[in-house]
Amino acid sequence: MKRALFIYNPLSGNRLVPRELDRIIEKFQENDIFLDMYRIAEDNSKIIEAMHRKDIDMIIGAGGDGTIGNVANWMIKEGIKLPYGTLGTGTCNNFTHNIDIPEDMEKAIHIICQGHSYNVDVGIVN
């Protein structure tokens, strides 16, 4: 069984993740992925600390573009080189749209569970 950090913004979009949490957990468990759940908060030091755990196989971010970007930035800053799955559950979800991740949560979860990956360029803007 694989283990993933599931980092979500409970306020993004129409608050889909908190309402669908049981179904999300079930879909990942059906694919032998155990989720360690973390909510985005004012102090995210526990999330960043958890990213360094040796028993973590992947990181999953669920939220809008801000949440997806914040998690990616933490990973880059901390030198975390794990697969990063994204569930676009925010208002616009431009990032997930641009890399062809479906809006349908079950389809997006399926892509993550199957290990499909995309290379994405990152940069720094001042």
Across the structure, where does each feature detected by a protein language model lie?
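Short amphipathic alpha-helical segments
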Residues: 18-20, 71-75, 97-99
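Glycine-rich beta-strand-to-loop/alpha-helix junction loops that act as flexible
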Residues: 10, 62-64, 87-89
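N-terminal small/polar loop signature for handling phosphorylated ligands or for N-terminal nucleophile
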Residues: 36-81
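Short beta-strand segments enriched in small/hydrophobic residues
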Residues: 2-10
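Catalytic core of DAGKc-family lipid kinases
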Residues: 5, 31, 38-39, 53, ...
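A short, Lys/Arg-enriched amphipathic alpha-helix followed by its capping loop at the start of a domain
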Residues: 23-33
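Gly/Ser/Thr-rich beta-alpha loop segments that engage phosphate groups in nucleotides
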Residues: 15, 65-68, 90-92, 102
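Glycine- and acidic-residue-enriched helix-capping/strand-helix junction motifs
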Residues: 11-21
